[in-house]
Amino acid sequence: MERAIFAGGCFWCMGQPFEEQAGILSVRSGYTGGHLPNPSYEQVCAKTTGHTEAVEIIFDPKQIAYKDLVELYWAQTDPTDAFGQFEDRGDNYRPVIYYTTERQKEIAEQSKANLQASGRFDQPIVTTIEPAEPFYLAEDYHQGFYKKNPKRYAQSSAIRHQFLEENWS
């Protein structure tokens, strides 16, 4: 099994697309990249811990390749916005691909270069690619949020879905 970590705005909106793929064993919401061990949602939202909201994905590389996960990641984000994603603003919502191996780093960097060269976006691709840091599991009520709160999920992801439809379909 392998592990992937992606930050692309609110973690509520990042889980479902990955959970729907064959070969995904788990998708967990949490926090990474900061300086405070085991931060709470409130601490991360206060923007004082340095963490980003992210999803940790455990996958079977025999069933789904990391490259495919990176491609799916791009299609969930606005890779030209370094200051958050959609209605979620600030460093805690910035887009980051966290790599857990040097091979993941190579794949992510090549994928980013390919996306930039594709001309899909007029602006530069600013998503960062950084080494994975400790991943702290978010509170239970954040896990599988889209399943537990479908109406609230739909409301909170409307702007994201419009962008994705216009730019990735």
From Swiss-Prot:
Its EC number is 1.8.4.11. InterPro entries: Met_Sox_Rdtase_MsrA_dom, Met_Sox_Rdtase_MsrA_sf. It comes from the Bacteria. The active site is at C10. Disulfide bonds: none annotated. It catalyses: L-methionyl-[protein] + [thioredoxin]-disulfide + H2O = L-methionyl-(S)-S-oxide-[protein] + [thioredoxin]-dithiol; [thioredoxin]-disulfide + L-methionine + H2O = L-methionine (S)-S-oxide + [thioredoxin]-dithiol. Gene3D superfamilies: Peptide methionine sulphoxide reductase MsrA (3.30.1060.10). Keywords: Oxidoreductase. The keyword Oxidoreductase applies. Coiled coil: none annotated. Has an important function as a repair enzyme for proteins that have been inactivated by oxidation. Catalyzes the reversible oxidation-reduction of methionine sulfoxide in proteins to methionine. Belongs to the MsrA Met sulfoxide reductase family. HAMAP family: MsrA. This is Peptide methionine sulfoxide reductase MsrA. It comes from Streptococcus pyogenes serotype M12 (strain MGAS9429).
